[in-house]
């Protein structure tokens, strides 16, 4: 009888507040990722940074874990269709954030930023506008392929330092 009552009450309980929180977290995640991408682009342009972008990435990773927990709580407490969507979304964004975090270790190895870093920085800044919930990345892939082709046409590095900088 108790389980039946719990199931019936769960069917009528309004989880709209939790759902709205998740949607708000999604927008916050998109905004923060856009900011982080722009800061990373500025870092590659060797601009003076007021804040440490790497510390900000680490701090936001912690926040992402809170969002994932909220998504699991929503899934565990509802019978609504597609509650796993929010979990998948936040886990995808966390994976993207971890890629940015790992990029830090690679960028730190570069002694002198090659000119290609500016091209990459511009592409990263371009990509920031496309960090939205629904995006089909066809245009971004085409642009990346164009950049890749342009880089293949460039002159080969002359010094070891230049070679290592480009390789990273």
PLM features: what roles do these ranges have?
Residues 1-20:
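N-terminal alpha-helical membrane-insertion module
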Residues 99:
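Heme-based O2/NO sensor domains and their adjacent alpha-helical segments
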Residues 21-87, 91, 102-168:
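Long, hydrophobic alpha-helical segments that serve as membrane-spanning/inserting helices
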């Amino acid at each position: 009888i108790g389980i039946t009552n719990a199931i019936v009450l769960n069917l009528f309980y309004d989880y709209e507040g939790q759902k709205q929180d998740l949607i708000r977290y999604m927008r916050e995640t998109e905004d923060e990722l856009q900011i982080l991408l722009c800061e990373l682009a500025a870092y590659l342009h060797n601009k003076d940074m007021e804040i440490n972008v790497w510390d900000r990435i680490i701090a936001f990773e912690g926040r992402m874990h809170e969002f994932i927990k909220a998504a699991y709580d929503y899934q565990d407490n509802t019978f609504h269709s597609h509650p796993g969507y929010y979990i998948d979304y936040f886990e995808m964004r966390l994976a993207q954030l971890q890629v940015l975090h790992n990029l830090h270790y690679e960028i730190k190895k570069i002694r002198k930023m090659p000119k290609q870093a500016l091209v990459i920085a511009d592409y990263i800044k371009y990509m920031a506008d496309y960090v939205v919930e629904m995006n089909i990345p066809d245009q971004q892939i085409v642009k990346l392929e164009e950049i890749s082709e342009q880089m293949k046409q460039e002159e080969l590095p002359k010094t070891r330092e230049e070679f290592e900088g480009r390789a990273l």
